[in-house]
Amino acid sequence: MAHGSTAHEVLAVVFQVREASEPVTKGRHRAKPQPNVLLWQRAKEPQRGAWSLPGGRLRNDEDMTTSVRRQLAEKVDLKELAHLEQLAVFSDPNRVPGTRMIASTFLGLVPSPASPELPPDTRWHPVNCLPPMAFDHGQMVDNARARLIAKLSYTNIGFALAPREFALSTLRDIYGAALGYQVDATNLQRVLARRGVITATGTIAQSGRSGGRPAALYRFTDAALRVTDEFAALRPPGLPG
């Protein structure tokens, strides 16, 4: 199809590790952390009502980062992100009908347990159970998830998913959810401490209803992205490191 003009849009793939209820036994459930992506329903044709990534057209007077932050604030009322970075460009001439639209995608992260107030047409969706999505937005989510998994290996990007202070069990659950496999808390603490990524706060968590020994609390040493080991790769248990 021939295109007489070209437009540019910015789209945000925003992840947060959120707790979901899963059945354990009849009548009993437990909270299971899992990665979610923020989606909103398109308000206009084509594919009006379809679930899609938040974003929109790039204005002539703004750069892409400014634009994506504006779109998130205006359209889904999301103003605070712990991390935002540009990902990839999707430029297939026929990716959307009508005017050719080039899309620049961004990865955004919201820490747990933040709970932004969302408009009625916007919702968190588990990445392993996504609804049918508009255009090529499903591919964009897959691309962003792969980038996040890779960066968890060689950077300190976990800071953007975790609370300010956390027990190692909480961090284990967040990393496990984001990576897609179980993570050992002791091994994770050893790796991240060796890289200077986390440090003990010297305080302990409040005891839960079940009692027991209170857990020591940790925090990330930085609240900005940095490479910690450019050749590192976290792998599922049983695979060679």
PLM region spans:
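N-terminal strand-loop-strand
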Residues: M1-W51
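Active-site segment of metal-dependent pyrophosphate-handling enzymes
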Residues: H8-V10, K32-N36, T65-E117, C129, ...
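A conserved beta-turn-beta hairpin within the catalytic core of GNAT-like acetyltransferases
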Residues: Q47-G49, S153, A160
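Short histidine-centered catalytic/ligand-binding loop motif
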Residues: L53-D61, A160-L161
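NUDIX/MutT-family hydrolases
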Residues: T105-G108, P116-L152, P163-T170, I174, ...
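Short helix-coil junctions and helix-kink-helix linkers
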Residues: D173-Q182
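Long, intrinsically disordered, low-complexity Ser/Thr/Pro-rich regulatory/activation regions
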Residues: A200-G241
